Amino acid sequence: MFAKTYGATTLGIDGRIIDVEVDVSPGLPGFELVGLPDTSVKESKERVRTAIRNSGIQLRQERVTVNLAPADVRKDSSGLDLPIAVGLLASYGMVPEAAVQGALFSAELSLDGNCRPISGILPMAITAREHGLTEFYVAPSNGDEALLIDGLKVYAVENLAQLVRHLTGVETLSPAMPQATEQKKDAAFTDDFADVQGQYQAKRALEIAAAGGHNVLVVGVPGSGKTMLARRMSSILPELTKEEAIEITKIYSISGLLGKDTGLVTTRPFRSPHHTSSTVAMIGGGSIPRPGEVTLAHHGVLFLDELPEFSKKTLEVLREPIEDRQITVSRANATLTFPSSIILVAAMNPCPCGYYGDKNHVCECSAGEIKRYTRKISGPLLDRIDIHIRVSRVDYNDLHTTQRAESSAAIRARVVAAREAQRVRLKSYDLFCNAQMNHSMIKKYCRLQSDAEGILEAAFHRINLSARSHDRIIKVARTIADLDGAQEIAAKHIAEAIQLRSDIGLNID
């Protein structure tokens, strides 16, 4: 007898519906699993048979063939255990075929028949709805994640025996309901700019970066607060939209980083990989590519501390995600494109010992050592970073002042207002910040007053700007004007943008 159920796997950050076709026929007893299964799926036939037996269900010894279609897609999800088991029971006539139509099954089975959670439930739920399926059977720990998508009846199934009783009408399971949990209000941040005394220029630069989605390089001596500033960047970014939150949750679900009963991710990611991270860890990879750090930081902040300590190869692969806001990973089995709309915040010392240019410490590095150190970061990579700032030690009086510094909430209010102006301006392009503008958009939306043009032209020749640097300065100036509520870019806006590009002394341009 033939039966068909639906399972799912993931490809990139999207779900893929898998037709599970089961045929039971007379002949030599056996269990064949075909359709390009990966190792974890090949092992499922042993888990399924043992789970069925330990659930108190006896099957006749016949020839079983399971086909996972489409056959040209590699299946690598242990979540196919449940649809294979249900399909097998349906082919034996133990479960009505009508009861499994229009339903997606996705859970790993333990040997005693219990349902275990898997990664990637959210993209599977989205794909199920797109394919017109109406019911989704998952492990209890995956219930909240599946409920993020409207239009599906989600059933949290404890074990295979319970599911069989439900499908045969012996027991009725009620659809899972969202748990009434309080969403965290991120108005009160753990890391707040109010804790940072002094460093006014650096805080201003990060505000501009947050408002326009610009990348930032912070150069300073040890103890000047580079890391402290960077870790507060997320606190001044606008709240996530529902679409952004779902996209981030999909990525974390695929990566297995979504905690139990986490539900929707509501805070912007902040990723800070160690400088020993490999290229694969940074951009993603594997035989079937999985997201790397640039994708895990999507719609958030990627912080690279001690930038020159990263391998040159790892740094150079950042060019594509910074420029295109996506990264393409090619492997023998698949070529996938992952999103990477990030704000890069990089920090570094000015020299190997860290004290070049410091008033209180003598730098022990030779000119050659400093040159080799700064050359670890290529010109093309630095050219893609919009804002370059240098920070010095915090003044004693700033450290001991009784006046509280401006809070993240106050800075964020200005950032949100500037972002709204950009959203309205760029809505026809489906863009949301100035950093995403291309050259034609810059010409259309970035009108410079005559004196501002004069300042830009002088800077272009004086500091030998590249065409890319020229455009990035204009985009930063447009953001500064948006923070001021100005329609045109004035001289003061372009002057500040130029200062934020050329004030770190690394001979970048």
Language model segments and positions:
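Conserved alpha-helical scaffold flanking the Walker A/P-loop in AAA+ ATPase domains
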Residues: 207, 264, 269, 279-302, ...
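Short loop/turn elements that form and flank the Walker-type P-loop nucleotide-binding site
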Residues: 59-62, 99-100, 132, 150, ...
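Conserved inter-motif catalytic segment of the P-loop NTP-binding fold
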Residues: 244-278, 285-286, 392, 432-440, ...
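Basic, amphipathic alpha-helical bundle interface domains used for macromolecular binding and assembly
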Residues: 37-45, 58-60, 67-77, 288-289, ...
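Walker A/P-loop
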Residues: 218-259, 324
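Walker B catalytic acidic pair
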Residues: 299, 305-306, 317
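Short beta-strand elements
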Residues: 18-24, 282, 386-389
